[in-house]
From Swiss-Prot:
Organism, scientific name: Archaeoglobus fulgidus (strain ATCC 49558 / DSM 4304 / JCM 9628 / NBRC 100126 / VC-16)
GO cellular component, one term: plasma membrane
Protein name per UniProt: Uncharacterized protein AF_1579
Spans through the membrane: 5-23, 27-46, 55-77, 87-109, 116-138, 153-174
Compartment(s) where it occurs, according to its Swiss-Prot or TrEMBL record: Cell membrane
Key word DNA-binding present: no
Domain of life: Archaea
Keywords assigned: Cell membrane, Membrane, Transmembrane, Transmembrane helix
Membrane topology: Multi-pass membrane protein
Length: 197
């Protein structure tokens, strides 16, 4: 019964996100919160699936491709509405996908359910707090910032790779979840120089 409830919440969240892209970001945000809550439970339910090497590699490649496409689209779009819709997808493609990839590696080293939940939510909290330091303070951010398209093509994939790989590297080297909880926000601080470009 709990598995069916988690799946139902997952599909409701996906529907809210889709509606939010069409109508208002507030709906999309509500869907994102629901989605974040049920993802780790579903990953633990399908533990064997998410611990496969092919699945883990596929999640990583999917995140790279999605973030590259969004980066290029943001660089060239002239529509404010379309640009805002793309920006509303970034929490999913940039943070959630990286978190699912890293959490899959945690599952692969046979971490307990409590450790998986602890890592998943600590990843979200630490990355969210780190992003606060990178938010523009001038109030004049552009949907299509100045800069070459090739730079936008690599910017989001590089940031995504840092979010996904740096915490995961500590997980694989030390085979302990608690050893890299401290390092989860570290990739964002590396990118402070990017925000000034």
């Amino acid at each position: 019964m709990r598995d069916k409830l988690n799946l139902l919440i997952f599909f409701i969240a996906a529907l809210l996100i889709a509606l939010g892209l069409r109508f208002t970001p507030t709906i999309s945000f509500a869907g994102l919160i629901l989605l974040l809550a049920v993802v780790p439970a579903l990953m633990l339910r399908f533990r064997d699936f998410f611990s496969r090497e092919a699945v883990i590699a596929g999640i990583f490649v999917l995140g790279l491709a999605l973030n590259a496409l969004i980066g290029v689209a943001l660089a060239y779009t002239k529509s404010m509405e379309f640009g805002m819709s793309l920006l509303s997808l970034l929490p999913l493609t940039l943070v959630l996908t990286a978190n699912v990839f890293a959490t899959s590696l945690v599952i692969r080293i046979d971490a307990s359910g409590k450790e998986v939940f602890a890592f998943y939510f600590w990843f979200l909290i630490s990355v969210g707090l780190a992003f606060l330091f990178l938010l523009p303070t001038g109030g004049s951010a552009e949907i299509s910032p100045r800069g070459a398209g090739w730079f936008r093509f690599v910017e989001f994939p590089i940031l995504y790779s840092e979010l996904a790989l740096i915490p995961s590297a500590f997980c694989l080297v030390f085979q302990r979840v608690r050893t890299f909880l401290f390092f989860s926000p570290f990739p964002l601080f590396l990118d402070m120089s990017w925000s000034s470009l």
